[in-house]
Amino acid sequence: MSSKLKGPDGRLPDRLPDGRPAVSWERRWTEGQLPLWLVATAGGIAVIFVLGIFFYGSYTGVGSA
């Protein structure tokens, strides 16, 4: 990412002066401190894991018939 696009506070502006997006939508998914697809994947795996623990507990622990 080029440093000339950054504002005085270090953040990227949302739009260029001519109205075009400052960062293309393709780069928004792959650049940054942590890619959004990686955060979403880790979150989805964590949700599936927690649900799996609940289902496992319902069949093996207290509450199983």
Swiss-Prot record:
Keywords: Membrane, Photosynthesis, Photosystem II, Reaction center, Thylakoid, Transmembrane, Transmembrane helix
Protein name (database record): Photosystem II reaction center protein J
InterPro entries attached to this UniProt entry: PSII_PsbJ, PSII_PsbJ_sf
Record family assignment: Belongs to the PsbJ family.
Organism: Prochlorococcus marinus (strain SARG / CCMP1375 / SS120)
Main location: membrane
Topological relation to the membrane, as annotated: Single-pass membrane protein
Lineage: Bacteria, Bacillati, Cyanobacteriota, Cyanophyceae, Synechococcales
Gene name as annotated: psbJ
Subcellular localization, as worded in the UniProt entry: Cellular thylakoid membrane
